């Protein structure tokens, strides 16, 4: 059993609609654990840095504007195959294509306002976690 970590964001549209608890319940119901979390209002510079890989793409400015439009919840999730499992729980980026019962199918407003983010690889997870958390802010929880 390989325990891994992934990074997750509850985006401004979901925070504004008071969906944090509902999203956390769904995460925990699947056996994944929240091992670090904080609410932030991203600055333009933080959002640009986090999404630097998309700089120059036509949607970049709108993405930065959206991610700075209100508070977000950033969290580290831990569990077996958590990167793959959380991406399955999120569903496809476009909520119209997301599997029924996924977070995006249930909560996203549109492709732009798609409620959640999750790392797509172990490398991305490590980079994204380190962008917002230092190691001693992460509190592993014993398995039941």
From Swiss-Prot:
Family annotation (CDD domains): NDPk_I
Domain of life, source organism: Bacteria
InterPro entries: NDK-like_dom, NDK-like_dom_sf, Nucleoside_diP_kinase, Nucleoside_diP_kinase_AS
Obligatory cofactor(s): Mg(2+)
Enzyme Commission code: 2.7.4.6
Active site positions, chain numbering: 117
Keywords per UniProt: ATP-binding, Cytoplasm, Kinase, Magnesium, Metal-binding, Nucleotide metabolism, Nucleotide-binding, Phosphoprotein, Transferase
Subcellular location: Cytoplasm
Catalytic activity: a 2'-deoxyribonucleoside 5'-diphosphate + ATP = a 2'-deoxyribonucleoside 5'-triphosphate + ADP; a ribonucleoside 5'-diphosphate + ATP = a ribonucleoside 5'-triphosphate + ADP
Chief localisation class: cytoplasm
Gene Ontology cellular component list: cytoplasm
Pfam families for this protein: NDK
GO biological process: CTP biosynthetic process; GTP biosynthetic process; UTP biosynthetic process
List of residues binding ATP: 11, 59, 87, 93, 104, 114
GO molecular function: ATP binding; metal ion binding; nucleoside diphosphate kinase activity
Complex formation: Homotetramer.
Annotated function: Major role in the synthesis of nucleoside triphosphates other than ATP. The ATP gamma phosphate is transferred to the NDP beta phosphate via a ping-pong mechanism, using a phosphorylated active-site intermediate.
UniProt similarity note: Belongs to the NDK family.
HAMAP family: NDP_kinase
Name of the molecule in the record: Nucleoside diphosphate kinase
Source organism of this protein record: Aliivibrio salmonicida (strain LFI1238)
Encoding gene, per UniProt annotation: ndk
């Amino acid at each position: 059993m390989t325990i891994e970590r992934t990074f997750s964001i509850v985006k401004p549209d979901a925070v504004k609609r008071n969906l944090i608890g509902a999203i956390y319940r769904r995460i925990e119901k699947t056996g994944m654990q929240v091992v670090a979390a904080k609410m932030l209002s991203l600055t333009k510079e933080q959002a640009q840095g986090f999404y630097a890989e998309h700089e120059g793409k036509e949607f970049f400015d709108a993405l930065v504007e959206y991610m700075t439009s209100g508070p977000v919840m950033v969290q580290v999730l831990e569990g077996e195959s958590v990167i793959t499992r959380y991406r399955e729980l999120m569903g496809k980026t476009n909520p119209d294509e997301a599997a029924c019962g996924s977070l995006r199918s249930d909560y996203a407003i549109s492709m732009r306002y798609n409620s959640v983010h999750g790392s797509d690889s172990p490398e991305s997870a490590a980079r994204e976690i380190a962008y917002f958390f230092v190691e001693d802010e992460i509190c592993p929880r014993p398995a039941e």
